[in-house]
Amino acid sequence: QVWYDREVTAFVEPG
């Protein structure tokens, strides 16, 4: 599952 990071404005994988 991915989450939307508004700070970078891109979909990233939390890790």
From Swiss-Prot:
It comes from the Eukaryota. On the 2D-gel the determined pI of this unknown protein is: 5.9, its MW is: 18.6 kDa. This is Unknown protein from spot 308 of 2D-PAGE of etiolated coleoptile. It comes from Zea mays. The lineage of its organism: Eukaryota, Viridiplantae, Streptophyta, Embryophyta, Tracheophyta.
